Amino acid sequence: MTYSDAIIKRITSLCIEKEITINKLATLSGITQSTLNSMINGETKNPKLKTLRKIAMGFNMTVSELLDFPEMNELEFEDE
């Protein structure tokens, strides 16, 4: 699993858990729908920390909480 795959999995699972759509998350996060869609579709391979912070805020959590999940903690980083 790549870094971007792990981020996509985390965002989609949190949307399911919190019962919000990707569109609603974009609104709550203050980012454009196209930016979030690019991430979810794997077009954005390395999202900026600023974007991750906004997404975390949309979920009402910190960046640390957003990135603290088993797949990310077990990920061995390689050049993508």
Language-model region placement:
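A short, Lys/Arg-rich alpha-helix, primarily the initiator
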Residues: 1-21
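Conserved hydrophobic/aromatic packing and binding residues within compact polymer-binding modules
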Residues: 11, 25, 36-39, 66
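The alpha-helix within a helix-turn-helix
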Residues: 15, 26, 56
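Recognition helix of helix-turn-helix/homeodomain-like DNA-binding domains
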Residues: 31-46
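Short, charged recognition helix plus adjacent turn
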Residues: 38, 67-80
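DNA major-groove recognition helix of helix-turn-helix/homeodomain DNA-binding modules
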Residues: 50-65
